[in-house]
From Swiss-Prot:
Similarity-based family: Belongs to the class-I aminoacyl-tRNA synthetase family. IleS type 1 subfamily.
Keywords: Aminoacyl-tRNA synthetase, ATP-binding, Cytoplasm, Ligase, Metal-binding, Nucleotide-binding, Protein biosynthesis, Zinc
Chain residues that bind ATP: K608
Protein name per the record: Isoleucine--tRNA ligase
GO biological process: isoleucyl-tRNA aminoacylation
Organism: Marinobacter nauticus (strain ATCC 700491 / DSM 11845 / VT8) (Marinobacter aquaeolei)
């Protein structure tokens, strides 16, 4: 037996089978950095239409987590895909650098500003801390394969950006949207600062709920309102609250004008008394209290009780009954304890009745001396002493613990309170900001579409935005207010620009160092400098002005896209929209894409206590960044994104299919030079020509999917193309032709031309997702090419089949179905042990009409398509005892091959051994080894 290996075109490539990504990717990163890929791409694309994805800045604190990775990978996939579309798509990453968490970290290291260190030193320490955090995060983002302006990111602590933030404030002031007010705001007693809605998150908390008697002052007048004198004992209006600590600040009780109230005779353990409760809630309240014996004496409308006076349950004072629209029958008693200091609805109803605030709680959460017996007590610890005082006064009806969802600071994770303080607000309604924003929302493309409803609902309910904070590390509110009138300086716009210029060179310290006398001249003594800082959401929210309009490589407003997690509907998307509408009257973005949160395989949130945290750094070090990138693509980002080690292992399996397909393509392009060996479309063998057309069809679909950010569909289509179209059909069929025909024959070069076109297209399709692998493939492709795939646009070498082409798309679609049916039959026979493989079989296909015509069209080459040693087409009338396949109208008979096996091509052919010199070869192989070589027309 001879060895014919040297006569075959065996696959060969230096492209490794194993990705070994964790080791290879860092080398690829260095390669990109050495080439300055991002910088060169910017030069190449200069003058092209821009696509600007504006980066929502992550907070400069801590290591990146899997959510950060999802966000940056999605952005990178979009930016890269737009680059392949021919756009100039720069990406300038940013960081949010000011705010409370950094202050806390620095306080732990060097102590409080103004106590242990001076403010300037403290701010510099904050700047140093943020810089260090940014470097750590930047390293991880780059490791993910994200390309961008990493050497010149935008930082909200950069003096130029800080100056831009100051100027943005000036524009909002100039437009009349800034107001100063004394209102209840979310207040962090830990941070001693106000918080905006976007900085609030809800967590479960154990609280005390209490029912409290407010005894009426004029019992006779109240009984007269109810039209009865029946019953005995005191008459009390009973409230229910989950914040006992606010009772000292109580100034009224609110009821519903249109709610009916019942006068109830009852004994809850303190003797006979009469309670006023919402009629519809009496039964539920009594059940909650465990009281069975009670009697409704009379009923009255809430409106009839307006302005009745009640005894405060703790202090020696009287409080009125008010009518409020916020009173509901969802929970409680139908009467609402009203403390304007500690609730927006309370504040609003109090304002309607001319009731102001008491300011009993200091910034640190302790009561002032005006709170009497509670002076110095912290609100976190006040429930117990307040309940004790109520018990002492005989006003506590019931008290019990319960768990509920409660607002917490999203940075410090500590419970918040509502506290009335003088603050600066952007008014939502003074100049129709709310209405204008709701109108602008309609003109934005929201991906997914439900994002529009979500942000609309938030804007409809959004209170005035409190933008002031009482912090050290933040952009200052650079305003001067008159000491007596509290009005802004008449030259505020001119002053803001002067301050902005100073900040541009000296950073935010310039505001504190500025000479007020020099700036204000003769007015200096009449004005005081505002010492509040801006909400960090304002910092990031105005980057459409301080970064997008200012950075030369961006220079476009509005941005084409904002992309963040779904929590940013109430965060960055909202703050950006509010400021942009206030400044420009238009939305700052044309499209907004949101992605869901990452959860484990069971849908649980990631937490160290559950042990289900997937750290991106670990994934990159074990599996490689491309596996993480592929997982992002293969997951529906519109909802929660499940990730676990098992899920990532499954992703790695999908990766291997794509990599192995690429390796097959590359290994079969050995000896192929596209400049010399490329076959023109009209000269290609029919199957090859169809393959190129199929790739073009898919490329058109993928272009559309990339345009619609449908990354899951892209992954599925590319995977199926590799698995089914290539692996299960085309590559299977062409192996014989590729390996056995003469090296420079049309049969082989046509096949290599198709493989080359497919490889050129595939490497670009996957590059936005599998960036490292794509560039590795790129370096192993034959022919002259640029240094990296990322300089390219979509491949333009794919050609469509001409109209009316006989062996067109429908033809090969039917052949594909036939091959699937035949494969099923072959597998059944192989499983019975009658054949070893498809080449040790002969098949007879029984069919009629057009199907028979189509199969016969291939003639002798039908066996190459079916990968059998013989394939014959016969009429159905001859199919006695042959079973129908799953393809209607086709019956298949499989029999073991009876002829000798060719040692070169492994086909069993009757002409094996007819040539004395090559006694173990079939005639076709003899022709290919020594003769002119075989010719193929179809497959």
């Amino acid at each position: 037996m001879s060895d014919y290996k040297h006569t075959l075109n065996l696959p060969e490539t230096a492209f490794p089978m194993r990705g070994n990504l964790a080791k290879r990717e860092p080398d690829m990163l260095k390669h990109w950095q050495d080439l300055n890929v991002y910088g060169n791409l910017r030069k190449q694309r200069q003058g092209r239409e821009k696509f600007i994805l504006h980066d929502g800045p992550p907070y400069a604190n801590g290591s990146i987590h899997i959510g950060h990775a999802v966000n940056k990978i999605l952005k990178d996939m979009i930016v890269k895909s737009r680059s392949f579309m021919g756009y100039d798509a720069p990406y300038v990453p940013g960081w949010d650098c000011h705010g409370l968490p950094i202050e806390h970290k620095v306080e732990q290291e060097i102590g409080k500003a103004g106590v242990k260190v001076d403010y300037k030193t403290f701010r510099q320490a904050c700047r140093d801390y943020a810089t260090k955090q940014i470097e750590g995060q930047k390293t991880d983002f780059i490791r993910l394969g994200v390309m961008g302006e990493w050497d010149k990111p935008y930082l909200t602590m950069d003096p130029k950006v800080e100056a831009g933030i100051v100027r943005a404030l000036g524009k909002i002031v100039a437009k009349g949207h800034l107001v100063r007010g004394f209102k209840p705001v979310y207040w962090s007693v830990v941070g001693q600062s106000a918080l905006a809605e976007a900085e609030v998150e809800y967590q479960d908390k154990t609280s005390t709920q209490i029912d409290v008697r407010f005894t009426v002052v004029d019992r006779d007048a109240v009984l007269k309102t109810f039209g009865t004198s029946e019953g005995e004992g005191d008459v009390s209006l009973v409230i229910w609250t989950t914040t006992p600590w606010t009772i000292p600040a109580n100034q009224a009780v609110s009821i519903g004008a249109d709610i009916e109230y019942a006068l109830v005779q009852v004994d809850v353990g303190h003797g006979a008394e009469r309670m006023i409760l919402a009629t519809d809630m009496v039964q539920g309240i009594m059940a909650r209290w465990g009281v069975e014996d009670y009697k409704v004496l009379a009923n009255a409308a809430g409106s009839a009780l307006e302005n009745q006076l009640l005894h405060h349950p703790v202090y020696d004072k009287q409080v009125p009954v008010l009518l409020g629209d916020h009173v509901s029958l969802d929970a409680g008693t139908g009467a609402v304890h009203t403390a304007p200091d500690h609730g927006m609805e309370d504040f609003v109803v109090g304002k309607e009745y001319g009731i102001g605030t008491l300011n009993l709680v200091k910034a640190d959460g302790t009561y002032t001396d005006a709170a009497g017996e509670f002076a110095g007590v912290h609100v976190y610890k006040a429930d117990e002493p307040v309940c004790a005082a109520l018990e002492r006064e005989g006003k506590l009806v019931r008290s019990e613990k319960f768990r509920h969802s409660y607002p917490h600071c999203w940075r410090t994770k500590t419970p918040l309170i509502y506290r009335a303080t003088p603050q600066w607000f952007i008014s939502m309604d003074k100049l129709n900001l709310r209405a204008d924003a709701l109108e602008a929302i309609k003109g934005v493309r929201w991906v997914p579409a439900w994002g529009q409803n979500r942000i609309e609902a938030m804007f409809e309910q959004s209170p005035d935005w409190c933008i002031s904070r009482q912090r050290t590390w933040g952009v200052p509110i650079t305003l001067f207010i008159h000491k007596e009138t509290q009005e802004l300086h008449p030259n505020t716009q001119e002053l803001i620009e002067k301050v902005a210029q100073a900040v541009e060179t000296g950073g935010i310290d310039a505001w504190y160092d500025i000479d007020q006398n020099e700036l204000l001249g003769a007015d200096a003594d009449q004005y005081e400098k505002v010492l509040d800082t801006l909400d960090v959401w304002f910092d990031s929210g105005v980057t459409h002005d301080s970064v997008l309009r200012v950075r030369e490589e961006l220079g476009q407003f509005p941005a084409d896209m904002y992309l963040e997690g779904s929590d940013q509907h109430r965060g960055w998307f909202q703050s950006s929209l509010k400021t942009s509408i206030a400044m420009n009257g238009v939305a700052p973005y044309k499209q907004v894409l949101t992605h869901g949160f990452t959860v484990d395989a069971k849908g649980y949130k990631m937490s160290k206590s559950l042990g289900n945290v997937i750290a991106p750094q670990e994934v990159m070090n074990e599996l490689g960044a491309d596996i993480l990138r592929l997982w992002v693509s293969a997951t529906d980002y519109s909802g929660e994104m499940s990730v676990s080690k098992d899920i990532l292992r499954q992703t790695a399996d999908g990766y291997r299919r794509i990599r192995n397909t690429a390796r097959f393509l590359l290994s079969n392009l050995t000896g192929f030079d596209p400049d010399q060996h490329m076959v023109a479309p009209e000269d290609m063998i029919a199957l090859d020509r169809w393959m190129v057309d199929r790739a073009l069809q898919l490329q058109n679909e993928l272009h559309e999917d990339y345009g619609n950010y449908a990354f899951l569909r892209i992954y599925q289509k590319v995977y199926n193309f590799c698995e089914a179209t290539l692996g299960g059909f085309y590559l299977d069929i062409i192996k014989d032709r590729q390996y056995t025909t003469q090296a420079d024959s049309l049969a082989r070069r046509s096949c290599q031309t198709a493989l080359y076109h497919v490889a050129e297209a595939l490497v670009r399709w996957i590059a936005p997702i599998l960036s490292f692998t794509a560039d590795e493939i790129w370096q192993h492709l034959p022919g002259k090419r640029g240094d990296t795939v990322f300089y390219e646009t979509w491949y333009e070498g794919l050609t469509a089949l001409p109209e009316g082409f006989e062996l067109g798309r429908d033809y090969w679609r039917e052949i594909y179905a036939v091959k699937e049916a035949v494969n099923k039959c072959l597998e059944e026979v192989r499983a019975r042990g009658e054949i070893k493989g498809s080449l040790s079989a002969e098949v007879t296909l029984y069919c009629e009409g057009s199907l028979a015509e189509r199969l016969n069209y291939l003639g002798e080459e039908l066996r190459f398509v079916l990968i059998t040693s013989e394939a014959t087409v016969k009429p159905v009338s001859e199919a006695a005892g042959v079973e129908q396949t799953n393809l209607e109208g086709l019956l298949v008979k499989v029999t073991p091959a009876t002829h000798a096996k060719c040692e070169r091509c492994w086909h069993h052919r009757e002409d094996v051994g007819q040539n004395e010199q090559y006694s173990d070869l079939c005639g076709r192989c003899v022709t290919n080894v020594e003769g002119p070589g075989e010719t193929r027309a179809y497959a």
